[in-house]
Swiss-Prot record:
Name this protein carries in UniProt: Hexokinase-6
Pfam (any one): Hexokinase_2
Further remark: Plants over-expressing HXK6 exhibit hypersensitive plant growth retardation and enhanced repression of the photosynthetic gene RbcS in response to glucose treatment.
UniProt organism field: Oryza sativa subsp. japonica
Keyword rRNA processing listed: no
Induction description: By glucose or fructose treatment in leaves.
List of residues binding ADP: 112-114, 261, 451
Region described as Hexokinase large subdomain: 237-486
Biological role stated in the UniProt entry: Fructose and glucose phosphorylating enzyme. Functions as a glucose sensor for plant growth and photosynthesis.
Subcellular location: Plastid, Chloroplast outer membrane
Gene Ontology MF term list: ATP binding; D-glucose binding; fructokinase activity; glucokinase activity
GO annotation, biological process: glucose 6-phosphate metabolic process; glucose metabolic process; glycolytic process; intracellular glucose homeostasis; response to glucose
Amino acid sequence: MGKGTVVGTAVVVCAAAAAAVGVAVVVSRRRRSKREAEEERRRRAAAVIEEVEQRFSTPTALLRGIADAMVEEMERGLRADPHAPLKMLISYVDNLPTGDEHGLFYALDLGGTNFRVIRVQLGGREKRVVSQQYEEVAIPPHLMVGTSMELFDFIAAELESFVKTEGEDFHLPEGRQRELGFTFSFPVHQTSISSGTLIKWTKGFSINGTVGEDVVAELSRAMERQGLDMKVTALVNDTVGTLAGGRYVDNDVAAAVILGTGTNAAYVEHANAIPKWTGLLPRSGNMVINMEWGNFKSERLPRSDYDNALDFESLNPGEQIYEKMISGMYLGEIVRRILLKLAHDASLFGDVVPTKLEQRFILRTPDMSAMHHDTSHDLKHLGAKLKDILGVADTSLEARYITLHVCDLVAERGARLAAAGIYGILKKLGRDRVPSDGSQKQRTVIALDGGLYEHYKKFRTCLEATLADLLGEEAASSVVVKLANDGSGIGAALLAASHSQYASVE
């Protein structure tokens, strides 16, 4: 082999080696660049999560301050302060069911696109609810934007049809008029136990000629047109109905809270502690107050940029601030907004932000709950929800665990804030502590209703644990939180019974 050949071969070998080194360097740089990009993505995700953790933090001291603010706003509302966020509406319910009620009573529950008609046969303290029946009726969409007469005539006609199906289990004493409790879950200025004028329609209703009118009178005239002899003896909202239903089962029920799509609370107040009450005090000495607590607001509430943006984009900015932090309508939406931030800032679901994640209210709270309760080792159920709802085909295990943590942060804040509100009611009633005079502790029951509380187990568990923590071990031993499943419907019938025109002759 000649010298030239050897040199040439050496040059080729060196060139190949250099090329290999070059490729290795490029590959190494790409790997390092990819690794650095991944580390940067994780750093950004951690920064977003850390900020959420800080802004959503609800230490016990903060919750006590929120409860104090709740008490202050309750007192302002009871004084009729025009600027008070809590309206503290007088319900005119001063006689709650005792369990002694007898007879046949009806209820009409109108609060959305459906309404329910209910009848119960009450058998007194021994037999309680002897029989109960109900029917649910969908309201045709055109009646939700029609006239007042058309809507109430439709309701009265359905009520009359329901009355005609009374069976042998239901008995009306001869010579007596049927009586009805009317649950009307729209803003009303109540003027007596059986009258109230509509302030405004909500929930998709827009009917001319009803605002400012007495809704009981509207229903009564419609029943007369149908030839239905029935008297409305109680007009209540759903939270007051839940309180009545709870009291019928347990005489120690002092308040009711609804935690569902929306939220509200009602409680039994001493009538002499209501400065805006005019006229004679009720014989019972008590009055049920409808707090409309969803509108509670305070600088102490731990609001974040996500809350502020949600409120700004809502149909009622500046209103229902508390509701927007704790109710089922909004918890899933808050989670969506945080996930969207993570998708934009930290590519949580890949380089492209899922289109559906931009859609407001696409993530409902029941879906959030299902993800939050996933106990599989790889969070496969959570991943399936993200795929079905947001269209994300493949999510990393890290992305799923981050989503789970976001659900936990939002649910925990909501539950702890709700517990602070309940603690505020207990403080207002003086039921938040052990009697200092050594007298016997008074048992206090809070009736809770609504799908959020009933079905979202982690929310419910957190709420109850937080309330116990706020009360302290000794005081907590005399406070009971009890599910009052669907109490508002039967509660209206029970209030019709306790305010019956025949009650004095029983």
